[in-house]
Amino acid sequence: MIFSTATAVSHPNIAFIKYWGNTDDALRLPQNGSISMNLAELTTRTMVTFDSSLPRDIFDLNGVRQSGPSLERVSQHLNLIRGIRGFSVPAHILSESNFPVGAGLASSAAAFAALTVAAVRTAGMEMSEKDLSRLARRGSGSAARSIPPGYVEWLPGSSDIDSYAVSIAPPEHWPLTDCIAIVEDAHKKTGSSEGHLLARTSPLQSARVADAGRRIDLCRNAIQKKDFDLLSQLIELDSNLLHAVAFTSNPPITYWLPQTLVLMQAVK
């Protein structure tokens, strides 16, 4: 018997000041706050159906039946929502994205934001934007930023209660366009979850985190004043800092490809 069904649409977000490393891996509490912009043209549409006739959760992603870690991660997140609602009905999840998954475009952020909203609706619950952001964070840290609209700041907090994202400016405040160059659409060899774990092994991570608050204040101010020169400088600096941490982690992570460097030089 179908218990209920609902659909939600979410968007990935591109971080200006990035999230990298946790103080609590289970709760996905970040070591530093972050600021991002939601990408309106990229979408993830997810339908969740709780169906008591199912033997277990079923997850279809872009028409492909999922198993292993992908299914397990989705089921674990649904268990949080089922636990809040107080039932254990299996679910069928249908999710489709119009952009590459696992290629550095925050696909997990959009996926878990959409999954959270759809599952909460399907379970017949109502939640505030703050609580949806908190809950989405448990599935993927960056998903907290895909709940509020427009330009978003993730407040790092120190517990599950106070780590969530808020909108600092609506989309129409500053109609920026993010130009995305996909140099490879294959899945990253090292996922972000593993990257967050390895961040603490880099001797550069503590310095990156220590200066994050200053960069966040400058970034927030740049958005409010629509100062593109300042914003672009901050974005490049913060990106380089993150990749420096990745390069110096143990084992090292290299997300840049030869084509990446060619594009970086061309833009300069």
For each predicted feature, which ranges?
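Alpha-helical scaffold segments in soluble metabolic enzymes
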Residues: A15-K18, Q76, A114-A118, L218-N221, ...
